[in-house]
Amino acid sequence: MKKHNFSAGPCILPQEVLQKASEAVLNFNQDNLSLIEISHRSKPFVAVMENARSLVLDLLGLKNKGYKALFLQGGASSQFLMTAYNLLNKKAAYLNTGTWSSKAIKEATLFGELVEVASSKNNNFNYIPKGYHIPSDADYFHCTSNNTIYGTQMKSFPETPIPTVCDMSSDIFSRQLDFSKFDLIYAGAQKNMGPAGTTLVVIKEDILGKVEREIPSILNYQIHLNKDSMFNTPPVFSVYVSMLTLEWLSNLGGIPFIENVNNQKATLLYNEIDRNPLFEGLSVKEDRSNMNATFILKNNALKNTFDALWLDAGINGLHGHRSVGGYRASMYNALPLYSVQALVDVMQELERKA
């Protein structure tokens, strides 16, 4: 029996995607060659890359709107550096909502002045700041849409006359947004898209070419755009599985369909956290993440009993991040509703035993 996988990342992927990927590793396109041993410049893989990029723009509603999609290496953490290298000329504005935005701020300070427009650090990042001012003379505004560690998520995004850069690593393709509000989006694959190894960048090409510095080729967005994500050898397997996952999502009905499912999952779990007297949520209710629910036991003496119950129920990956503790249930796109119900059942069983 497959486990209920609440891992924060790498995370659960659709079963049909795993099946197709495993077949491709042995025999890709019935050519008696493995996907991971063919040339990345062969016609079969070039078709994979083109399809993956096209699916990204289709799903986000950005086709024919001046955007291009890139599949790069280095993880989303590499984008903390790369965005600033390519966009920060003098000053940038950053919203600090957690560990990942803090890391992005640290990297960006290497290239210019940083304005931290707001931060929720004062309360261990358990909320999203509101009502902050973004300086109009900044080169861009950077935010993180979802915070896996603390369980918060931006529900709206500020209107700003400057370019907006967003780290959507943990909630891209999970909800409907006007993605044309963003000039650059980046996301590590290993949450809602595929296995670790590739990073998606969706970029409006007209924001490039404005910094007064030489940019190393491997870190230069324009070079990667000119080479269609083939400047160097791409992470073939990760791109292929990401393509399969995007096809899966598209066939289901795209983002509108999966957003409805994600809302059902989050509502089910948060209702139980709020109802059950043994548990307490860690994030402010209005800013709760649909992707990552963080919570604790009010009585830590019940920890061993609860842990044994959820492990016996075939639940995986429920421990909270080491910097926060408690529990974290990550409910990415591929997690079925019945897995959330299994967790709720365990929480109710603990209540009966307590």
Regions found by a protein language model. Name each.
Residues 9, 108, 120-172:
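Active-site phosphate-binding strand-loop segment of PLP-dependent enzymes
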Residues 3, 328-354:
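PLP-dependent enzyme catalytic core of the Aspartate aminotransferase-like
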Residues 76-141:
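PLP-dependent aminotransferase-like
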Residues 32-82, 99, 107:
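Conserved N-terminal alpha-helix of the aminotransferase class I/II PLP-enzyme fold
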Residues 165, 179-190, 199:
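Conserved active-site segment immediately N-terminal to the catalytic lysine
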Residues 1-39:
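N-terminal "arm"/small-domain region of PLP-dependent enzymes with the aminotransferase-like
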Residues 279-309:
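Conserved PLP-binding catalytic core of the aspartate aminotransferase-like
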